[in-house]
Design a protein with these regions (language model features):
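Class I S-adenosyl-L-methionine
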Residues: 205-257
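Rossmann-like AdoMet
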Residues: 1-61, 78-115
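Glycine-rich SAM-binding Motif I of class I
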Residues: 70-75, 265, 269
């Protein structure tokens, strides 16, 4: 019998048998605070004393996450967008995930965060039939669009087009998931970043920092002792990136090649769902 995507430990920690690492810490309060501190504050999406959130007044905002996991960063971002003053009219969130969790795992994880639980139920409603490939879930009346790229991180990133304003790198630790942190993967991330885009990650490994710099990111610092491990960077290449597709629309995937389907019958697989 195959291992489950998520194995729950006795202390409530969700664990990945495939990668041999935990999705988050055992304490719900700490996990939520870490998501906000590392990723939302790290990318300037929450206001601070004397500083507005950087997405305030923007017509749209595009977030790219490598490592969707159990959706905590997505739900936290969605919640922050809902609470934001002069929020962007549209939030596009694109996430790559090797193996999507089951709806029950999403629900069990979100149950630890009461303010996120209603959003999690809206996410779970269209969460079915997530075969390898790209799926778009329309949420909050279409104002929030979640694009899920299901598959290994590097080839999935290669399928995406567009320019992203915020980037979350949330894969498991390099020792557990080395593909996530290889140079060619980070180059694929850089290809999708607009100039000035902010990046945040919990990974502070020296070799990852060096690879980000090689890809055109300026590392702005890591958190001080006593704070959650985190790294912040800004995409500021010294070279001129190749022209790319405008970011005025929802993130897209590369145009597929033609194919023939034999014996499909009347069934049609819809990759875009609305809640």
């Amino acid at each position: 019998m195959a291992d489950p995507v998520v194995r729950w430990r006795d202390d409530g920690t969700p664990f990945s048998p495939r990668f041999g690492d935990v999705y988050r810490s055992a304490g719900p309060a700490g996990a939520l605070a870490q998501a906000r501190q590392v990723f939302l504050h790290g990318c300037g999406l929450l206001p601070t004393p004397g500083q507005e959130a950087i997405w305030r007044g923007a017509p749209r905002w595009q977030v790219l996450e490598a490592g969707f996991g159990l959706g905590l960063n997505f739900l936290t971002t969605w919640h922050a967008w809902r609470q934001a003053a002069e929020r962007p009219r549209q939030l596009f969130y694109t996430a790559v995930e090797a193996v999507p969790p089951e709806p029950d795992d999403l629900r069990r994880n979100a149950a630890a965060f009461p303010e996120l639980a209603p959003l999690a139920e809206s996410l779970i409603a269209p969460w079915h039939g997530l075969l390898p490939g790209v799926h778009r879930l329309r949420l909050d009346g279409g104002q929030v669009q979640l694009t899920l790229a299901i598959g290994d991180v590097q080839p999935m990133l290669a399928e995406l087009t567009g320019e992203y304003d915020s980037i979350f790198l949330e894969g498991f630790e390099p020792a557990c998931n080395p593909q996530m942190w290889r140079l060619h993967t980070l180059r694929a991330v850089a290809r999708l970043a607009r100039r000035g885009a902010r990046l945040a990650t919990r990974c502070v490994a020296h070799e990852v920092r060096e690879r980000l710099v090689a890809c055109g990111f300026e590392v702005e610092g890591t958190t001080a002792a006593g704070s959650p491990p985190a790294l912040r960077a800004r995409y500021a290449p010294r070279w001129t990136p190749r022209p790319r597709r405008s970011g005025d629309e929802a993130p897209m995937v590369a145009q597929p090649a033609r194919c023939a389907v034999v014996g499909a019958g009347p069934e049609v697989l819809w990759l875009e769902r609305a809640s």
